[in-house]
C-alpha cells in the first residue's frame, strides 16, 4: 500500500515542495490504514483517491485566499487536511459529528504535527454553533435534514445556514454537474462563480462553486 501511495503522489504532485509531498504521503498512509477497519473514505483504491480526491483538493486550494477555513462534515479529512498541508499559514478547522472521523482527524493532526489544524466534534446544524472562519467548505456533505432535498434546495439550505455565522464571506462547494443546472432564480438570489476542474486523469467533470455572501 505504502509503495502505491508513494509512487502515485510523486507522479501527481511532482512540483510540490518535498515537505508537503511527504506530509500528503503520511496522511494517505494513515487514511487507508484507518479505512481498512473503519470505512472513512469513498474508495479503497489508493490511485483513484489520489488522482481524484487529493488532486481536486489541491486545485481547490488555489482558489482560497482567506486566512481561515472551516471544512464542514470533514469525514476523513478531504479536502480539509490537504488544504492544511498545502497552506501551513492558514487556520483550518475540521468539523464532523461522528466520533470515528474525529478520532482519526486528531491522530492525523498529532502525527503530522499540523499546528494550523483545529478538530471539533460538532453538528453543523446545531443552532448554537457559529463558524469563526472566513470561508466554509462542503464536499459530499450529507445530513438527515437535507437528505431528501434536490441539489438546489440543499445548496440553498447550506448557504443560508452558513450566513448565520457573520464571519464567513465565502462558501466553496466541491461538486459535480448539478451545479450547472441551477435555476435563474438561484443565480438572482446568490452571487456565484463556477469553475471546472481541468483534470488530466478523469473525463468526468467536477466543479468548484464559489458563493459570495
List PLM regions with ranges.
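N-terminal cationic-hydrophobic initiation segments that often serve targeting/anchoring roles
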Residues: 32, 61, 84, 162-163
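Conserved class I S-adenosyl-L-methionine
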Residues: 66-75
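Sterile Alpha Motif
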Residues: 1-3
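Conserved SAM-binding motif I beta-strand of class I
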Residues: 91-96
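Generic detector of well-ordered alpha-helical packing
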Residues: 57, 72, 97-98
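Conserved SAM-binding loop of SAM-dependent methyltransferases across substrates and taxa
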Residues: 76-88
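Class I SAM-dependent transferase core
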Residues: 5-66, 104-115
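S-adenosylmethionine
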Residues: 97-213
Amino acid at each position: 500500500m505504502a509503495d502505491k501511495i508513494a509512487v502515485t503522489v510523486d507522479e501527481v504532485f511532482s512540483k510540490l515542495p518535498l515537505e508537503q509531498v511527504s506530509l500528503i504521503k503520511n496522511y494517505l498512509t494513515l487514511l487507508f490504514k484507518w479505512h481498512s477497519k473503519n470505512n472513512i473514505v469513498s474508495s479503497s483504491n489508493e490511485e483513484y483517491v489520489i488522482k481524484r480526491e487529493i488532486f481536486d483538493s489541491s486545485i481547490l486550494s488555489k482558489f482560497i485566499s482567506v486566512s481561515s477555513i472551516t471544512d464542514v462534515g470533514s469525514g476523513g479529512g478531504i479536502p480539509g487536511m490537504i488544504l492544511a498541508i498545502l497552506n501551513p499559514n492558514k487556520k483550518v478547522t475540521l468539523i464532523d459529528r461522528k466520533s470515528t472521523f474525529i478520532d482519526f482527524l486528531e491522530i492525523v493532526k498529532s502525527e503530522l504535527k499540523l499546528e494550523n489544524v483545529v478538530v471539533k466534534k460538532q453538528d453543523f446544524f446545531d443552532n448554537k454553533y457559529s463558524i469563526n472562519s472566513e470561508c466554509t467548505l462542503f464536499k459530499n456533505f450529507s445530513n438527515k435534514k437535507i437528505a431528501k432535498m434536490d441539489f438546489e434546495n440543499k445548496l440553498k439550505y447550506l448557504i443560508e445556514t452558513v450566513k448565520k455565522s457573520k464571519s464567513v464571506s465565502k462558501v466553496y462547494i466541491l461538486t459535480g454537474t448539478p451545479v450547472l443546472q441551477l435555476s435563474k432564480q438561484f443565480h438572482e438570489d446568490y452571487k456565484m462563480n463556477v469553475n471546472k476542474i481541468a483534470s488530466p486523469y478523469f473525463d468526468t467533470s467536477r466543479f468548484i462553486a464559489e458563493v459570495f455572501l
